[in-house]
């Protein structure tokens, strides 16, 4: 067997191995949950909340029950709060809100016991955003990596 043929066979085996590795990653390691740094930096409150589903619409109900205020500023949030734009929210770590489950909700206060899921702020150089069309993120607390990312993005106060 000539030297060129050996190099060709080795190259084909390495290429096939590389394609197999990429196929494995595509099949089993897809859709990781990435917690948005800009959304966390723009938020004023971070709560673990239980979200109920409205039986009529199938969408999340605006009233959510706070389980824990993760980084309280002043008095910690507790009880039931209203999240006005939760129906627009997307969920990292799941296809949609589901019961039962704990969700990390990055919030911005808009009134007494009334909050919005924080939308991602405008990036430098980006044209004006129509905030009515932007869908904010909530995160499944038990999804792989969410707790660790949150801890690294939002230090304890």
Regions found by a protein language model. Give the residues of each.
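Generic structural motif
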Residues: 54, 67-69, 73, 86-88, ...
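Netrin-like (NTR/C345C) domain of secreted extracellular proteins
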Residues: 2-29, 86-157
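Structured catalytic/translocation cores of nucleotide/phosphate-coupled proteins
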Residues: 41-46, 50-52, 77-87, 91, ...
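Hydrophobic beta-strand residues in large extracellular and virion-surface proteins
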Residues: 51, 64, 81-83, 103-107
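OB-fold (S1/OB) nucleic-acid-binding surfaces
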Residues: 59-83
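Short boundary/loop segments of OB/S1/cold-shock single-stranded nucleic-acid-binding domains
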Residues: 24-44
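Structural detector for short beta-strands of small beta-barrel domains
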Residues: 42-68
């Amino acid at each position: 067997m000539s030297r060129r043929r050996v190099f060709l066979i080795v190259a084909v085996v390495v290429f096939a191995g590389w394609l197999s590795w990429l196929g494995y990653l595509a099949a089993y390691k897809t859709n990781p949950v990435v917690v948005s740094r800009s959304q966390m930096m723009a938020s004023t409150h971070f709560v673990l909340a239980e979200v109920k589903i409205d039986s009529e619409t199938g969408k999340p109900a605006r009233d959510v029950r706070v389980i824990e205020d993760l980084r309280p500023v002043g008095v910690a949030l507790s009880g039931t709060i209203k999240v006005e734009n939760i129906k627009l929210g997307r969920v990292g770590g799941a296809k949609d809100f589901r019961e039962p489950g704990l969700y990390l909700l990055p919030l911005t206060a808009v009134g007494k016991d009334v909050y919005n899921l924080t939308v991602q702020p405008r990036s430098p150089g980006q044209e004006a955003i129509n905030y009515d069309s932007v869908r904010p993120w909530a995160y499944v607390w038990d999804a792989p990596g969410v707790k660790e990312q949150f801890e690294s993005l939002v230090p304890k106060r």
